[in-house]
Amino acid sequence: MLDEVYIEKLIKKKFPLKHSFFPTGIGDDAAIVKTNSNKLVISCDSQVEGVHFDLDYFTPEEIAFRSVSVALSDLSAMGAKPKFFSNSLFIPKNINASFLNKLFNGFKKVCKFYNIYLLGGNVSKSKSLILDLTVIGEVVGKSYKERLNSKKNDFIYVSGNIGDASRGLNILKNKRTFSSPEKRLISKYKSPKAKVDLGIFLGQLKDVTSMIDITDGLALDLGRLIGPKTGGKGATIVWEDIPKSINHTESLSSKKLMKSVLNGGDDYELLFTVKNSKVANFEKLCKKNNFKVYRIGFVNSLGHLSLVKGGKVSNLEANGFIHKF
């Protein structure tokens, strides 16, 4: 019989019961963990069938890996090192024991990939599959990053190609056979990787003034990073400087490409600002530590976002994905 007792046994079978930092193990009313940090970083995220993923084109392992990766991306945006997560599962009637076994194989894989540990969670029945995660990290050293701390003339950077995931999702929705370049774009959507190492590295640098992860689209998250218009800050980004994969740029018209890159979302790249006077040293440090970063614009005092494309300046609306209820 598939019930919560079965799931608890499944979790205990696949995950070690106790560690030196996790004395209670899975199965108690709550988890007790030991940490060396005086600052914990905590975030939560939900992945909902029909909203964030579709069972028609996701395997159970992929669902598990993606759900944890996108949650950990929020910790990376704060410069934190991920340590633990808990997961509440809401399970519909069409999910069977084989599916759950594969799902927890995915959780085991993602734990190994990020060197993190599952603390436990909760289960309940539902009309659709929902994974509700809480992720816990710790501050490395004394420094962490927040949004809104950028200053006028700071330079704006991203950590990788923008728009690939959005294009990959579009391909998934409209095709059933894929070329190799299309498979690479689809992978960006289905299997994003949190920028953990880069986030920790940037978190320790005083010259990095603010940071966010790109979840809902470059333009929308840039607006969140810069802050409300009432604050007087604005930003200008240059289209030609935004990193885009060849697979992406060759497959879309100019208008569709702009929408995918600026408003698509699901990139889970880091978007951050660096002090104007320190960019040369910053870029040297990144190169020395084998981190690729891309300068795409600067903070100004115009009170709005703007885009430079082909030498022409236009207003950039902070549009992207927003949950509507």
Give the ranges of each region predicted by the language model.
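Helix-biased detector of long, well-ordered alpha-helical tracts
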Residues: 1-325
